Amino acid sequence: MTAIADRPVPASGAPAVTPGLPHVDLLRLRDRLEPAERARLDAIEDHLQTRVRPHLTRYWDAEEFAFDLLPGLAELGLGRLVLDGSSSLFQQLVHAEIARVDLSLSALVGIHNELNLGMIAGLGSERQKATWQGRLESFDALGAFCLTEPDHGSDIAGGLATTATRDGDEWVIRGAKRWIGAGTIADVALVWARDTADGEIKGFVVPTDTPGYEATKISGKMGLRIMQNADITLDVRLPADAILPGATTFAATRALLRDSRMWVGWQGVGAQMGVLDVLRSYALRRQQFSRPLAAFQLIQAQIAEVAGNLAASAGMMLQVDTLRQEGRMEMMHAAMAKATSTRLARSSAALARDALGGNGLLTEHEIAKIMGDVEAIYSYEGSYGMNTLIVGRALTGVSAFV
């Protein structure tokens, strides 16, 4: 079978970047970077726009993972972004640039860095690091973060049902996980299970070739179709040292989960950058009544609203990232930023879909793809509703959780 990236690119694909017009980084956040990081970001953007983006709609339509694009991402250092010593703003702008071309790819790189590699490097044993860190950094191995369960999503901290039982010099892990990104293609899974001895939620490193690990692809999704989400069943025996030594209580993971929630806010920024790319390009190329769509006031109003949503999201994310660097970011900030950015991304995608008319329903014009993908980021890493409850509790001192 011919790799998707080797197949011809359809002529109908719109150019992402419109030369001579303002960059979709409307607030010029990249100007805050040091020159070396700015040059690196420009190189990453160029690779994503010219070597990656033209192929992604076909992967999305086919519900296939883009394995043949990983070597190029590894060459750019995206497999070890969280460990390379770059500035926080640079890392977040990279996440936005990846989301600008595709949210599945962004989810893979983000979860890979923020959760899988980040947790093994930060919470793992020396043996676990030696076994997995190098392979993950080069994308020679992929990881899966196994927390959500079939019956427990928003209530996972209190309701997690997967169990870990110590049996001599082994751990026995039994349970089920759902919606696990890369679950069918990962080489290693970080599995969260409740210790039957003390009731604490603990992390375990589980090679996916371990007998009793079974992953089934979730098909028919309306969004994140490139990401291979999976149902996972576990009935495995692991050596005693499979436990993550820095993750023997769920509290140990909260800071990483908080930071990953903020990262999803940057996905919302990137998605809106992609929306503006496609909407502006289409409005300039598409002719109606012998004029480009961009010459009509209603279309310009939609473009301006998308731009405002994007700028508002980017400005919020910049300040929240600043608070994080200063050690002052609280869960309220991460929840508010994630909820707001993804809500505005949803609105921006809908505005662009309307402007494209019937063509907006076709994935070849990309907006339909972005709309579906945005629905996923609106819901994962804390649904919109749950994040608003976190913010409301922080602002009023009253919990509305039931």
PLM segments and residue spans:
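C-terminal helix-coil-helix/basic helical segment that borders enzyme active sites and/or dimer interfaces
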Residues: R53-D61, R280, L284-R291, A307-T340, ...
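A short core secondary-structure module
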Residues: A176-A215
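A gly/ser-rich beta-alpha-beta helix-loop segment of oxidoreductase catalytic cores
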Residues: A144-T165
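Glycine-rich phosphate/pyrophosphate-binding beta-alpha loops
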Residues: R178-G183, S260-W263, A376-Y384
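Glycine-rich phosphate/cofactor-binding loops in nucleotide/flavin-utilizing enzymes
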Residues: T2-R30, V94, L115, L356-V402
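Alpha-helical transition-metal enzyme core signature, strongest for iron centers
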Residues: L136-F139, V269, M273-L276, I303-S313, ...
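Glycine-rich beta->alpha junctions and the first turn(s) of the following alpha-helix
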Residues: R28-P35, E214-A311, I377, R393, ...
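Internal helix-loop-helix
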Residues: F67, P71-L142, A182-V188, R324, ...
